[in-house]
Amino acid sequence: MPFPKIAEVRELSDEEIANEIAKVKRELFDLRILKATGRIEKTHLFKHNRHRLAQLLTIEKERELAKNAEASTTVSTVENTQ
């Protein structure tokens, strides 16, 4: 099973990203429970889910920084015109 591509994550809306983050965190929690009880069969899912979570959090942070940069640019432009 190949890792998910980051291009797929970039196509998601902010709300979808937030939902996916919650979903992946829940899956990681469930995997840890299975590991603790000794019933886990697909140990590679830890790596895949951590990778997916990192992608989602990276895109979320990029968008947050872009919004902040845009807002600060707008504020500085307004201050310069006065």
Swiss-Prot record:
The keyword Ribonucleoprotein applies. Keywords: Ribonucleoprotein, Ribosomal protein. One of its GO terms (biological process) is translation. Pfam families: Ribosomal_L29 (PF00831). Gene3D superfamilies: 1.10.287.310. GO terms for cellular component: cytosolic large ribosomal subunit. InterPro entries: Ribosomal_protein_uL29, Ribosomal_uL29, Ribosomal_uL29_sf. GO terms for molecular function: structural constituent of ribosome. Belongs to the universal ribosomal protein uL29 family. NCBIfam families: L29. This is Large ribosomal subunit protein uL29.
